[in-house]
């Protein structure tokens, strides 16, 4: 029987499936951070259980770390306790930890792929919703809750029901300057923020194949923002070239054998999907969200929509509420909307390719008066690479703040946050009310678009910036 990539990955990991019961899946990799793990380790301790497979468990600190100092005390009492607990737990249970002073420390979904911890064909979980990022490698990756974190630590397995399947095909080639972030925002604009609920999404089509691994990670990272369980891109030569030679990747003949298997991780011809969505890549322009969910998105050249134009009463009410929170009036051009802060970072857009794209816009320009702009590399490795290329100097010269790795202003769990009423052009993944700080107003954009907003003081079409 013809199978989708998701069905192949799922079936290959079923440990046990009794009739009328939820299947038990084997988990190949478990990524751990300081926020969702303390209670899980306490649960192990209470029952006298070890971590079943410490060699398949990798930990780092990211959510509430300071991006200005490596001092564990810098972000308050709760952050300090969570980080100290992680240090204690990893030591006690034999789990490898990339702490604040480790060169590999960084956002968990940046660190995993760059260390070769993430490989095609794997099942990967983490107590974090954006675990879907790793699906870019043709791995089944999804976020889990803290009680499930404990279950995986104890057994290296997890009960999981089968999801529905969705194919999103982006046909043709994207125009110059259009990034994975623009593509995924355009997709969510079409499906809505709940369009993928109950599904695992496979992204395909020429525009997807053309993306680098960094771009594919951006894409899969935001699958969760359309309500999907996970996102997938089938592995190909781009994937294999990225993985080859990385720290935890197979070497020599083992790598060749792995690639032979990875090449089978494609959706079979004739396999059927529960839902199919198609977009034309050439129709996608730079995207900017205007509301309070990622599906409320328009082209940079559009005007702020009028809630009255929505036929669906639920959408209309949602748009009215969003505009009131965002402090925007219907009909005004998006390019006239001024911003207060810019955040370039997060597990969506903090990799080297993202920083290069932002630096290209920032080079030889200055951050607009009254704007604070942060650039937060996704990991110690990304930071070192960017500095080797001189990107930090470009940003600093332009008036951006060059920070230490961490989740930073993506979420209000550390010192980097918006004040009430402040408007931010952000490369992160969520624009809910209060996501970046109470009363903060978030607009999601690509790294180049964020840099353009920083230097102009408002949203600007990067295609017009020479």
Curated annotation (Swiss-Prot):
SUPFAM superfamilies: Aconitase iron-sulfur domain. The keyword ATP-binding does not apply. The gene is leuC. Keywords: 4Fe-4S, Amino-acid biosynthesis, Branched-chain amino acid biosynthesis, Iron, Iron-sulfur, Leucine biosynthesis, Lyase, Metal-binding. Pathway: Amino-acid biosynthesis; L-leucine biosynthesis; L-leucine from 3-methyl-2-oxobutanoate: step 2/4. It comes from the Bacteria. Coiled coil: none annotated. It catalyses: (2R,3S)-3-isopropylmalate = (2S)-2-isopropylmalate. Binds 1 [4Fe-4S] cluster per subunit. Pfam families: Aconitase (PF00330). GO terms for biological process: L-leucine biosynthetic process. It comes from Shigella boydii serotype 4 (strain Sb227). Catalyzes the isomerization between 2-isopropylmalate and 3-isopropylmalate, via the formation of 2-isopropylmaleate. InterPro entries: 3-IsopropMal_deHydase_lsu, Acnase/IPM_dHydase_lsu_aba_1/3, Acoase/IPM_deHydtase_lsu_aba, Aconitase_4Fe-4S_BS, Aconitase_4Fe-4S_dom, IPM_dehydratase_rel_enz, IPMI_cat. This is 3-isopropylmalate dehydratase large subunit. Its cofactor is [4Fe-4S] cluster. Belongs to the aconitase/IPM isomerase family. LeuC type 1 subfamily. [4Fe-4S] cluster binds at residues 347, 407, 410. Its EC number is 4.2.1.33. HAMAP family: LeuC_type1 (MF_01026).
